[in-house]
Amino acid sequence: MVEKNTYFIGVGRRKTAVATVKLTSGNGVIVIDGKPIEERFTRVQERNVILNPMMVTDTMGKYNAVIKVLGGGVAGQSGAIAHGIARALEKSDDKLRATLKSNGLLTRDDRTKERKKPGLKRARKAPQYTKR
């Protein structure tokens, strides 16, 4: 466990979202942009993505998290927060690194939206082919 006044910062990214996570020892309160997690992310799937690093490392209820997240949508933001929490947990205890790494939580998911190409309607969708 960590001392009272120490904190660990982790920056997570997913798609265009960037999350800064500040972990302190506590009782499991998670505040995202000044709101509790239940108010900020209403769907259970997104909350499960966010809490996954803590569930895997069995640190639920041991840390409080204050999170600032910018950019992206709901899925990108929840992924960025999970990545940030995983990085902060790794800084708090080196023994957790193996568990986080084996579950793929320290790897930055670099899948982003593919750019639109000229002559196409979207990234890959071509206009309808006409024979004559």
UniProtKB/Swiss-Prot annotation:
This is Small ribosomal subunit protein uS9. One of its GO terms (cellular component) is cytosolic small ribosomal subunit. The lineage of its organism: Bacteria, Bacillati, Chloroflexota, Dehalococcoidia, Dehalococcoidales. The gene is rpsI. It comes from Dehalococcoides mccartyi (strain ATCC BAA-2266 / KCTC 15142 / 195) (Dehalococcoides ethenogenes (strain 195)). Residues 100-132 are annotated as: Disordered. Transmembrane segments: none annotated. It holds the Pfam family Ribosomal_S9. Residues 114-132 have a biased composition (Basic residues). The keyword Ribosomal protein applies. One of its GO terms (molecular function) is structural constituent of ribosome.
